[in-house]
Amino acid sequence: MSAVTKRSGSYGRTLGVGAVLVLVLATLAVVNVYTNLAPEMSGSQQSMLLSGLVSILLIVAVALLFVATIIGRERTAAVETLAAQARQIEQGELDVDLATNRTDDVGDIYRALAVLRDSEQLDRQHGVSAEVVAQYCETAVEISNGNDDSRLEENVDDPQLAELAMRFNEILDQRKRDAEIDSR
């Protein structure tokens, strides 16, 4: 069982304990009302009072069950969705949509997860950029050693590095053309 499932289960248990506590308090109130009023009533009135109080208690129990179910399902569904999105990010899928309008703690977790995802995207981009820069340095060394056929890779994800490579390659091409003209 994952930590997220344990926590959502814990939340459900807390909600259930709260509902049971309210039901116990309502039962104690019903018993208190009945024990205070029943001695002064006739048998049929006592029966009607008991019937009415039991009906009220049942209505409270059903209402609590309904509210607990609705709140629990909504909360559990939100946590399960968030857990699924976190698993996608964990597996490397960084294009997961984490936009939310929630203002509760689940919304806070969504926003925190979005920050982590964005940070991972930047780290990946910087890693790729660092690789490209290292390749560019190697190519520059080759060119300085006389390899006029070396070129910088223009097909990279970073638009600024692609622009740099294109312009650098244009300069090399022009230099090569000028050298050919001078050699004639």
Curated annotation (Swiss-Prot):
GO annotation, biological process: signal transduction
Membrane topology note: Multi-pass membrane protein
Residues of the HAMP domain: 73-125
Compartment list: Membrane
InterPro entries linked: HAMP_dom
Domain of life from the UniProt record: Archaea
Keywords: Membrane, Transducer, Transmembrane, Transmembrane helix
Listed transmembrane segments: 14-34, 52-72
Signal sequence segment: none
CC annotations in GO: membrane
Induction behaviour: Expressed constitutively throughout the growth phases, both in presence and absence of white light.
A Pfam family this chain is assigned to: HAMP
Its job: The HtrM-Xop2/SRM complex may interact with CheB or CheR and modulate their availability to Sop1 or Sop2.
Stated family: Belongs to the methyl-accepting chemotaxis (MCP) protein family.
Subunit organization: Interacts with Xop2/SRM.
More details: Is lacking a methyl-accepting transducer domain found in all other photosensory transducers.
Name of the protein: Probable sensory rhodopsin transducer
